[in-house]
Amino acid sequence: MLKTKQEYQIYWATHHDVVATTPEEVIIYDMIDEMANDGNSSKFRENITKWVLGLTESKSKHGYDDDKMAIEVKPQNITREKTKLTGGGNFNDLTWRRHRKYLEDELLILQSGFHHGKLVYIVEFPYASIAPVLEARLQDVLPNGDVPKVYDRWGTFKCQDWGQHPYKVRYLSQDFIHYQPDISKCLREKLVQQLDESIIQGKMLLSTLNLL
């Protein structure tokens, strides 16, 4: 039985079909749907990504997306037809100083994919895997080093950048087959590849939450 706001949010985000059993749940799930697909804020999707992996919501307004570890959450949510999940993300305030700090801190990226607010997958990889493509951007924007109040606002990466390096699939939806048509070829291959390897090794990648 769901009791807390967090439990309702996780349940809604990790199940493709959610049926409200009471008038109160209709209101709750409508509110969650609105939060999950808010185009102006990714806070809900960041929290879901962390909660599913057993991490807690960050209380700090500065620094990384986790209060204890060097982690950045990069969720992607698609809500329009003909748009696909690509395994990509971006840094909108990158500088050489921050770039070097990310490397020194051995920053981990949690890149997650959402389909109309529903969690499809979570992959984990080191920031170092996407460092070359971000360095190329920094060379264009800040060729002579950092300049006060100047940032690389379009430091983007994609599946092809991290997929050629070691990565982990931390979560895969039990409804993955339903979402496959809306996943890019590169990302789909990376997710299925790890799933196949895990089956061979006798491991389960599908998330199992005690509260469910």
Q: Model features per residue range: what roles?
A:
Residues 1-69, 74-212:
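Nucleic-acid endonuclease domains
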